[in-house]
Structure formats: structure tokens, C-alpha cells
A protein has these predicted regions:
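Conserved catalytic cores of very large enzyme subunits
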Residues: 91-95, 101-490, 507, 511, ...
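Short amphipathic alpha-helical segments with coiled-coil-like heptad repeat character
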Residues: 19-23, 77-80, 302-308, 509-513, ...
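Long insertion/accessory domains within large nucleic-acid-processing enzymes
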Residues: 670-709
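Contiguous, well-ordered alpha-helical segments that form the cores/surfaces of helical PPI scaffolds
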Residues: 494-507, 527, 684
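Charged, amphipathic alpha-helical regulatory modules used
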Residues: 1-108, 703-708
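Short, conserved micro-motifs enriched in small and acidic residues
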Residues: 16-17, 491-495
């Protein structure tokens, strides 16, 4: 400190001038600017500024010192650091403001705020209910940025260093995605809207209660949720037994069995129909349908094996039928997402349930679902266990209860922070030593951001969402009891996401990560990210995991920021999007089987969240080829999807691929229709199915996808 020099603060008070504060501010800006800490330069600038004022200049103000720092950084050829420093000043200035959301909210109302309106393809920003959620999100985001999240993390988010996901929900102590403990809730009862819901006495009631549970769960969190049919299968037996007991008093046992079977199958059909229609028509407090996944699994030799098989078959049959829009025209459904578990008995090698898998293959060609998970690979990666993803792709890590038993349902994800790997590479400018230095600096920042998420949840009372914390969705805590134990010791997860393995490799090596050289580097980076998560887990006891970010709008945001900062670079920033996680670039010519095999090695590292897909043409007349892909998935990759283009033009009745013109506008190739309300365009967006509404970057990515078969 300089004893003879004071500085005038923003509130007009005086404090002792401390050049170390200038030095530390410059070093922090270097971390998010050039990525390399030039300690000598930071020290020199701080000393130069101190000399200016010691030599008789008027008493410095904070603002004047900041202007001098910026000028000195430019003079010292530290342009990127100067930009980062200026960005930090802007964030700090923003944090001192109030009423900063006027423009963004008015932009929602007059439809000019396209970034927010098109951020999520499953949110229709034209609807009042959705607009209300989006407006609340803008206000919440503003408060979080100014009051809750440290300025340097907000700055890193704004600079595209990282992405603090779901910032619009950060001010509430709610979590991301989860596996609903439906077994507990249906068996032991639950409470919905302060009303006791006892264990169902029939399959139909179980299905109705399940949809009510999902709606309540979805409204109390911001991510996806998943259930397994294993938890509703016992209630199909309950219905059969009820009918059998009724009929055996009047008829022979054989006749009673036949009648009970018929009534059970009728109830099966109506129960599944209830789930489908409820989950497709419900709107949660988030302004959208619940992001729900149903896990279709059959436990061979299990007590309810037959019921599970019946439910699987009926679920797929009804999805194949589709629904109708308000005009009575046939359409597909976005939700629920179906994930079908492939095992020895249904992997199309002569198993007893191959007939269901063949039905699933047919459904793929028309409805894009189900997705496929390999029990063979899951058991290899998760100590012999199988369980569904939480929503789209997020996976839990192993955790055992006090009795040494694995527990999956009733667990959740606390939140996600994603790292922009492309910016790390662009900052390093092909200098490999610098790349690893910058990567480690930014991993430290991601860890800090994830700890902010964790700390915002600490101390939350169970009353915040009784259906989650008190009535079985996750736990059965007492009123007022803190949820803290469920945040620690790996019970729930914290996800480190990542974007742009392909572009990162191009920026550093000038080749795709599918080349031998590129693959080696990409895997090295992936393992480095995983090692970081493992280290954080060891140091904190928290459930850090590596997660392949879906990034529906994020990939466009990162690319836009980097293009402004580094310019247009071939195969890196020359498009409107970056590639999700580790995926092969959408324009790269590669065989379906080769693609799945290549990406499978990334699944084995990214165990906190992974999925792969292949793009195929209309396969309705070539089901054996679809079945071949399904069998390949079982043997080679943990989790994968088959993408077709089952679009419909409502004006002329055309079914097939709705095309994109040069202006990124959808049109019917048969009649030229361009009215979005007169067509349904269904595409796999980021694990979930979206229809008609995407941002420009994602639309361009969709348009450039090549076929893999």
C-alpha cells in the first residue's frame, strides 16, 4: 500500500491506494483474456499507475484508475486481456444497476428477443403461459447475475469461457434432472397438493397418479425426469387379480382367467393412453410439457416379467399410432421420450422378446423413438447395473445405501456448467503447452461455478417442494428438514459439460478428431476432463461427473462469441454453431456403424452424460437395416438414437422430409408451403425431439446433417 496516496471510491469516500489490487485485477483479466498469466506485465502496469499519481497527479478515482489500466494493457500489447478487463468492469457496473430487464422482457412481448424465444424448441414463446415463464426467467436471471453469482463467473459466462446453465432458475433452490422414485410413491402413497394419494388399487389409477406425480415433479425443478415401467408393472397384476376374484365367483377358473385377462388388457390400453395424452397435453409451471422419459425394460426372470413385456409392447404400439392435431390430422409426439433397454432376450438374436424390438424398429422409422440403451455396455460401465438417463442424457454415478445396495431412483443432478473447449484452443493458438495451461485455468473456474450451484442449494428446507423431499419423489424428510445430506457424498451429481471437441481439434491440429492424430488428442483432452472431475470428487466428496452437453442454443452462443473475438476460421468458427460434445461433425461423411463405434469410446469416459445418433433416410421399407443398427448398438455403445425425418405438410398431405431453403425457412417440397402452422417438422434436437421451432444456429446444424446409411 502507498501510505501517502489515497483513492476516491465510487461512493465518494477515500481509501488507501493499493497497487496489489490493480495487479490482481489484471491477472484475473489475463486468465479470461489471453489465458496466460504475464505476472511481470501486471506488476509493471500497477507500478506505472502508482508512479503517475505519486508524481503529483490529482487524487485518483476508481474509474480513472480503471481507464488507465485499460490503456496500459493496450500499450503493452495485451488486447485480449484489455477486452476481458473491460468486460469485468461492465459486469461490475451491471451489478450496481437496477431495473436492467426492461429491454429483454419487452423483446419477449414484441417477439424481437429471438435468443430467448428460440432458446428451447419445446417452449412455444407465442403462448401467454410460456411468455410468463420466460419473463420470470429474465427477471430471475438478472437478480442471479447481479446478486448471487460472483462477477468473474458472470463475466466468464458472458465471454463464452463457460456456460452457467439454467441461470434463469438460479435464484430458487431447485435442482436440475432426476430419476423419480415412483416405486416408493405408488407403493407407500404420496401427497399431491396437500391431498393424500394412497397406493393405487388398479393399473388405470396407477397410470393417472403417475402423470400427476410427473406434472408436480416437473413444476418443482427445471430439468428432465425419468420413470421406469417396472414401477407400474405390479399394478397391472393388481388389476388382473381384482378381475379374476370377481369372475371366479360366477364362472369356471378357466373362464374367469380369460375374462380377467381381457379386462386387464383393456385397462392396459387405456392406462398407457392416459400416460401418453397427459404427458403430451400437460403444461407445467415452466411453460412447457414435462421433459419426461419412460424407461422400457424387461427383467427376464423377474416377478413381473410378463407385465413389463405387455407394457413395453403397448407403449410402442400406441406411439406408432401417433396422435391428431386440432384439425384431426395425424401428428407425432415430442413427449414422453422412450428409452428401450436392449438385453440378451431382445437384441434380435433369437430372444423371446425380439418381437417387441422389431416393433420398436418400425416405430423408429415413423416416430423417431424409442432410443436404445445397451444393458451389456451399461453393466460393464456401472458395476453390473442398468438404469435410465435422467431426462435426456444425464447419468448418475454409482452410489450404495447403508445396506450396501445400489440406489438409482430418488437421485438427482444439482446443475451443469459447460466449458467452451473451442475457445481454449483458439486462445492457445496451436501452442500445445499454452493449451493445457489455459484448460487447467478454466477447469478451476468451472469447479468454482459448480460450487456456486452447490452452495446455493445448501440449507434448503424440504418445504421448497414437498413432493420431491417429503413425499417420496426423492426422499421422505420431515417438514423444515434440510436437504443437505442429499447434496453430499455423491448421492446427487454436479455436471461438468463440454462443447466442441471437433472444432477444438481443428483449431489445434487442423484435422478432425476422427483422424488418428485428432482422435488421440481428443481422447487425451476427454481423459483430462474426467481426471479433473475425479479429483474434485475426491477433494470434496461431491458427485462431480463428466457430461456431454446437449447445448441446443449454447453451441450457437459460444460460436457467435468466438467469431467476434477471433474472427472467422475455417472448420472452426465459419458456421453458426459448434458441435455438441464429442460428436462427429454433422457434415462429415461416415458410415453409421463406424460412427457409433468411434463415439462409443467417448461414452466410456463421459459417464456423467452421453448419447450418440445416426442419421438415416426413410427406412420404412428397409426394416432389416434398422434392426441391424439396433443389434450393433447392443454390442458396441451405451446409448444411441436413430434419426429419421417423419415430417408432415398439412396443406397437401405430403409425408417425408420438409426441406430448408437458403434463407433457413422450412418449405414443403411437394406444394411449396412455408407456413409453420401448416406443417410438422420433427427432428432430434439434442436427445429430445423438437418440432418447428429452433434458433438459427441449430437450424443450420440440422440442415447440414448428412446421412450415415
Amino acid at each position: 500500500m502507498s501510505a501517502n496516496l489515497s483513492i476516491i471510491k465510487r461512493d465518494g469516500s477515500k481509501a488507501e491506494f493499493d497497487k496489489l489490487k490493480i495487479e490482481n485485477a489484471i491477472l484475473k483479466a489475463m486468465k479470461y483474456g489471453s489465458g496466460v498469466l504475464e505476472e511481470d506485465i501486471a506488476k509493471d502496469i500497477a507500478e506505472e499507475i502508482e508512479k503517475i499519481y505519486l508524481q503529483g497527479s490529482p487524487s485518483p478515482t476508481v474509474s480513472k484508475v480503471e481507464e488507465l489500466v485499460y490503456k496500459e494493457l493496450i500499450d503493452h500489447k495485451q488486447e485480449l486481456t484489455a477486452k476481458a478487463y473491460e468486460g469485468y468492469r461492465a459486469v461490475q457496473s451491471f451489478k450496481r444497476e437496477v431495473n436492467t430487464t426492461d429491454d429483454s422482457i419487452l423483446g419477449l412481448l414484441d417477439k424481437s428477443n429471438e435468443d430467448v424465444l428460440n432458446e428451447n424448441s419445446n417452449k412455444n414463446g407465442q403462448l401467454a403461459s410460456t411468455q410468463r415463464d420466460l419473463m420470470a426467467g429474465e427477471v430471475s436471471k438478472d437478480i442471479a447475475r447481479r446478486k448471487l453469482i460472483p462477477a468473474h463467473i458472470v463475466q466468464a459466462h458472458d465471454e463464452g469461457v463457460l456456460h452457467y446453465h439454467d441461470m434463469d432458475y438460479a435464484i430458487q433452490p431447485i435442482h436440475n434432472c432426476m430419476l423419480i422414485n415412483l416405486e416408493d410413491m405408488l407403493t407407500n402413497g404420496t401427497v399431491i397438493n396437500n391431498k393424500l394419494v394412497e397406493s393405487p388399487k388398479s393399473f388405470a389409477t396407477a397410470c393417472t397418479v403417475t402423470t400427476q406425480i410427473i406434472a408436480q415433479i416437473a413444476s418443482g425443478q427445471y430439468g428432465g425426469n425419468s420413470i421406469t415401467i417396472k414401477h407400474i408393472a405390479p399394478f397391472l397384476r393388481v388389476s388382473y387379480n381384482k378381475y379374476f376374484e370377481k369372475y371366479k365367483e360366477k364362472y369356471s377358473l378357466e373362464m374367469a382367467h380369460e375374462l380377467a385377462e381381457d379386462r386387464m388388457l383393456e385397462e392396459l390400453k387405456s392406462g398407457i393412453q392416459t400416460i401418453r395424452y397427459q404427458l403430451s397435453t400437460l403444461h407445467t409451471s415452466n411453460g412447457q410439457s414435462p421433459f419426461s422419459t419412460i424407461y422400457l425394460e424387461i427383467e427376464e426372470g423377474g416377478e413381473f416379467e410378463r407385465e413389463e413385456a405387455l407394457i413395453c409392447e403397448e407403449m410402442i404400439l400406441q406411439r406408432l399410432e401417433g396422435m391428431k392435431n386440432y384439425r384431426g390430422q395425424e401428428i407425432g409426439e415430442e413427449f414422453p421420450k422412450l428409452v428401450y433397454l436392449l438385453d440378451e432376450h431382445n437384441c434380435l438374436e433369437g430372444g423371446k422378446y425380439d418381437y417387441i424390438t422389431k416393433l420398436a424398429a418400425k416405430c423408429n422409422t415413423k416416430r423417431l423413438v424409442p432410443d436404445y440403451q445397451s444393458a451389456k455396455i451399461m453393466r460393464r460401465n456401472y458395476d453390473g447395473e442398468t438404469f435410465p438417463p435422467m431426462g435426456c442424457r444425464s447419468h448418475l454415478s454409482n452410489w450404495k445405501d447403508e445396506n450396501g445396495n445400489y440406489k438409482w431412483y430418488g437421485r438427482f443432478n444439482q446443475g451443469v456448467v459447460s466449458l467452451n473447449l473451442v475457445q481454449v484452443a483458439l486462445t492457445a493458438n496451436k501452442d500445445m503447452k499454452k493449451f493445457w495451461e489455459v484448460l487447467d485455468e478454466r477447469l478451476d473456474l468451472c469447479r468454482e461455478a459448480l460450487m456456486v450451484r452447490h452452495n446455493l442449494l445448501l440449507g434448503t428446507p424440504s418445504d421448497i417442494s414437498p413432493i420431491h423431499w417429503q413425499h417420496g419423489g426423492i426422499a421422505r424428510l420431515e417438514k423444515g428438514e434440510k436437504i443437505d445430506p442429499l447434496l453430499k457424498n455423491g448421492y446427487s451429481t454436479l455436471s461438468l459439460g463440454y462443447v466442441g471437441i471437433y472444432e477444438m481439434t481443428q483449431a489445434m491440429l487442423g484435422v478432425s478428431h476422427t483422424t488418428e492424430e485428432g482422435e488421440e488428442f481428443a481422447l487425451q483432452v476427454m481423459n483430462h476432463l474426467k481426471d479433473a472431475c475425479d479429483l474434485w470428487k475426491k477433494e470434496t466428496g461431491l458427485g462431480f461427473g463428466l457430461y456431454g452437453t446437449p447445448g441446443e442454443s449454447l453451441t450457437s452462443r459460444f460460436c457467435r462469441i468466438d467469431k467476434q473475438k477471433f474472427g472467422e476460421i475455417e472448420n472452426v468458427t465459419d458456421r453458426m454453431y459448434y458441435t455438441n460434445s464429442y460428436h462427429v461433425h454433422v457434415t462429415e461423411e461416415i458410415d453409421a456403424f463406424e460412427k457409433l463405434k468411434f463415439e462409443s469410446q467417448f461414452h466410456d469416459i463421459s459417464l456423467g452424460g452421453c448419447i450418440s445418433y445416426v442419421e438415416v433416410p426413410d427406412m420404412s421399407k428397409n426394416l432389416p437395416a434398422v434392426e441391424q443398427i439396433i443389434n450393433y448398438i447392443y454390442h458396441n455403445i451405451q446409448y444411441a438414437e436413430i434419426n429419421t425425418k417423419p415430417d408432415v405438410c398439412f396443406k397437401c398431405g405430403y409425408t417425408g422430409e420438409i426441406k430448408l431453403d437458403d434463407d433457413m425457412e422450412w418449405y414443403c417440397p411437394n406444394c411449396g408451403n412455408k407456413d409453420k402452422d401448416e406443417m410438422q417438422v420433427m427432428r432430434r434436437t439434442c436427445g429430445y425431439i423438437g418440432s418447428n421451432m429452433w434458433g438459427k444456429g441449430r437450424t443450420q446444424e440440422i440442415s447440414q446433417r448428412v446421412l450415415h446409411l
